[in-house]
Curated annotation (Swiss-Prot), chain A:
The gene is TGH. Functions as a component of microRNA (miRNA) and small interfering RNA (siRNA) biogenesis. May assist DCL1 and DCL4 to efficiently process and/or recruit the precursors of miRNAs and siRNAs. In the miRNA biogenesis pathway, associates with the DCL1 complex that processes primary miRNAs (pri-miRNAs) into miRNAs. Binds pri-miRNAs and precursor miRNAs (pre-miRNAs). Is required for the interaction between pri-miRNAs and DRB1. Required for general proper plant growth and, in particular, initiation of vascular development. This is G patch domain-containing protein TGH. Residues 159-199 form the G-patch domain. Residues 489-498, 779-808, 858-877, 913-923 have a biased composition (Basic and acidic residues). InterPro entries: DUF1604 (IPR011666), Surp (IPR000061), SWAP/Surp_sf (IPR035967). GO terms for cellular component: nuclear speck; nucleus. Residues 701-711 have a biased composition (Acidic residues). SURP motif repeats lie at residues 405-447.
Amino acid sequence: MGSDEEDFVFHGTPIEREEEIASRKKKAVAGASGNLRTLPAWKQEVTDEEGRRRFHGAFTGGYSAGYYNTVGSKEGWAPQSFTSSRQNRAGARKQSISDFLDEDEKADMEGKSLSASSQFDTFGFTAAEHSRKHAEKEQHERPSAIPGPVPDELVAPVSESIGVKLLLKMGWRRGHSIKEVRASSDARREARKAFLAFYTDENTKETPDSLVSETEVETSLGEDIKISESTPVYVLNPKQDLHGLGYDPFKHAPEFREKKRSRMSANKEVGFRKPLSMKESLFGPKSGKIAPGFGIGALEELDVEDEDVYAGYDFDQTYVIEDEQPARQSNDNRLRLTSKEHDVLPGFGAAKNSDYSMERFNPPIIPKDFVARHKFSGPLEAETKPTVSAPPEVPPPADNNLKLLIEGFATFVSRCGKLYEDLSREKNQSNQLFDFLREGNGHDYYARRLWEEQQKRKDQSKLTLDVKVSPTVQKMTAETRGSLLGEKPLQRSLKETDTSASSGGSFQFPTNLSDTFTKSASSQEAADAVKPFKDDPAKQERFEQFLKEKYKGGLRTTDSNRVNSMSESARAQERLDFEAAAEAIEKGKAYKEVRRATEQPLDFLAGGLQFTSGGTEQIKDTGVVDMKSSKTYPKREEFQWRPSPLLCKRFDLPDPFMGKLPPAPRARNKMDSLVFLPDTVKAASARQVSESQVPKKETSIEEPEVEVEVENVERPVDLYKAIFSDDSEDDEDQPMNGKIQEGQEKKNEAAATTLNRLIAGDFLESLGKELGFEVPMEEEIKSRSKPEDSSDKRLDRPGLKEKVEEKTSSLTLGSEEEKSRKKREKSPGKRSGGNDLSSSESSGDERRRKRYNKKDRHRNDSESDSSSDYHSRDKQGSRSRSKRRESSREKRSSHKKHSKHRRTKKSSSSRYSSDEEQKESRREKKRRRD
Amino acid sequence: MSATELPTKEAHILKGHEGAVLAARFNGDGNYALTCGKDRTIRLWNPHRGILIKTYKSHGREVRDVHVTSDNAKFCSCGGDRQVYYWDVSTGRVIRKFRGHDGEVNAVKFNDSSSVVVSAGFDRSLRVWDCRSHSVEPVQIIDTFLDTVMSVVLTKTEIIGGSVDGTVRTFDMRIGREMSDNLGQPVNCISISNDGNCVLAGCLDSTLRLLDRTTGELLQVYKGHISKSFKTDCCLTNSDAHVIGGSEDGLVFFWDLVDAKVLSKFRAHDLVVTSVSYHPKEDCMLTSSVDGTIRVWKK
């Protein structure tokens, strides 16, 4: 083989086979994928489309650097949208010239064709072409199941309808009306016949002409009638002159109206001639003259039918004119009649319905009595009064009766007014007694008297004002005040005068010493100070008493001593009395209720005057603050306060307001505090009388308190009534035991009863809570809640135990032995109670058993009976209650003391910390219980 | 009794509060003491040995008053955060919070059976809260006072409140009546005698006034101490023979109940004495002050 190759020599490139090319491509693709995935970057090679290796864009300028090894095509990575060819397979389109023509050639084809616009499309050809084009467009746009041209191309719209064609054949021309055409056609046919007859027989008789003329006249009349019916009058006879509406220049000259009409007719004839001449010149002999009627369109050509054979004859025209005239005359006559009847302008008619109706308001009617000027009578009368001067004095008339009459009448007139005088004057004209009113006898006296009466009336008005002021003045005087107050100030005033005369010097000293006091007060005090000296020299004992009281005044006594000359022995005695008074005051500070009670009767015995004087002095003194505070403060006030029922329950007390609605909450604002201030001022300023009344008020206040207590206590709850009823029964059974037993036993009994009551109360409270009521009032409620009782009762058992534990811990009773005894005694009661609770029986039976249990307890505990007696006794009266309350408090305090001593012993024995001690105490309690 | 029998000897000083102590109270049997102050804490002490047992922290502001139940299992406290806290003593957990006051709460008290808490507040009202049920609404609101209510005392049938409007008002639940005793001076603190017949009212005119509860009469007046600007305390001894009052100058005064005579006075603290509490049985006394200390006094 090697030798063969060496022999042959090859020239040129060998031909590549397809298989080799395909294999190369495959290799390239595989290599590329392999290179991209497996080979690292520095091992990758740039290859050509055919898989050949090539340099990396060194010679191509880097154009294809990012093409190979990255994307699959030169365009990039944009995928192409897929379109299926199923729809295009079935389509078989016909070829036409437009398919093979270019756009330029198509434009040239379109430009050559000419078409009329829609305005001038009389034959409708343009519309047909447009419709065909539109159909073709639609055919191209929408696909059609049936191949081939659309039927719309075959069917083209037609601009003219069959009706139009028929009319055209019958002689109608566009622009003419249908009615006129018919009438004119008939006339024209007859005209043709006549014309033909005329031309054939020129030398015939005249009779056929007259017949033809008659027929024409009839036809003309018919036409006129039809026209008059259809068209209104003013259209036939339009207004041609320039006169105003309703103006008739020929009203009084009908002759001229006729002449004008002839002129008008002549003008018409001239009008007819002119167009005829023109037409003859234009159209020649054939056309002849045009028939009367509507004109033909300017653009249309004249047909043979339009020619009028009898256009040249004037006779026919004259007949027509004459026929029109009577119609006009008749119209004019109608207008005249309407104008005369309705007074309306000629040519117009009165309207049938007139909506406008104007309301007319007549001017007001002036009363006959009305006077233009307004006269003010008031000011004139007022002005006349002051101008009247006082008439001169006139002596009374001789007759006494007349004098009296005049005086009385003057008073009446002054009161009632001048009218009274005028009326009486008129009434009494005949009466001679009233001549003085008419300037008779006594007129002058009457005038004077009247003036005097008026003056008096004026004065009385002033006097009334003075009278109003006077009572206030009277009140201010000292005498009236004294009289109102009573007799006491009178006595004082008498004494004051004497004292002032006797001791002028002493009067001045107290004012200087006590600037704060008022003069009246100081004067009164001076009088009081001076009083005993006159009486005392006779009785030394009374003098000593007065001195004791005066010592409270202090300075005043010394002043009085200086003024009055006393013996040395008397002064010495006074000093001793002062010392005694001082000792009494000191003791008074430490006084108690008992001492106060003893002192009060002494004050009353001394007398009203002394008591009042002492009070005033104490109030004015500023030195003794304690005494002042003791009397002014403390001040007790009482209000009604309503405790909430739960609060009463927690304190084991009955609610005093059970069954009452809660009152509205009272608003105690700052204003209330302000209101209290004036009361204190009034109290301070109260005088002797008010002070005496105070104790009465106090007594009255105390009484309702007692009543309130009784009422409140008597309103316990039904549950508590059950307890008390049991106690009362026990009292009846054993009334004597309470008295016999000793004091020590009583204490124990009290404790036991309290225990029993507490237990019962808590038990009942728990029942109420669990049932859902705070305090069950009625038996019905209990009966309704029977099914619940069983479950509630089971719950009650642990509750009872818990309560017992709490109470034992809280109680402060004395001996341990007593506690153990009571527990043993109570245990059978509890067990029996549990049995009752477990059974579901009626409430009545339960109550009875409870009562038996309580009775058993009372019987077992003989000590408790006497304590119940105590409680029953408390009910009797409120006074006894207060005393017993104090005694019970003392007993309780003694119990507390004993319990405290025992507790101290226990505490001293313990030596451990608080926690351990508590634990031990609990353990001990448990052991004791066991 | 003579002055020597009064507890004027200092036994212990209880230190631990980091600010003013506003109240110090014995418990029912007198074995322990609870104190509260401006450091927002309540501390449980054994005053007889001067030992701090426990500290309770939950208040957001100063604590003004505390009171323990008679069974020593729970206590309540109030203060500037306008709430009344109901605590468990052993666990130190807040059982419940009573909210409703519009201002600071100045005083709290339990009733005898510990079923109800009554609080006196800056909003001129007394509010009663129920400890048995789980409701947080007040059982009753008493708002007849005209000014801040500073102190409250409870008996078996009555609620007594002292107010800055100068009145001591008694609300009797058995009769349904309110009795208002006007003293004319702002009432700072009220205390009731052990026999329940008298009320001692500390007023801001440096005077203590003893009133008869049934009649409203003024029985006695005690003077000598200074009480014009700060809340000071006053109380009676367990024998009701002496009246004790704190002063703003750090002194403690003992008066005779009947004679109103100053039996003894001694300097207990350097600053204002904020609280005075007497032992329910023995002759022992607690005083607290603004200086942050609580002192125990014995014979």
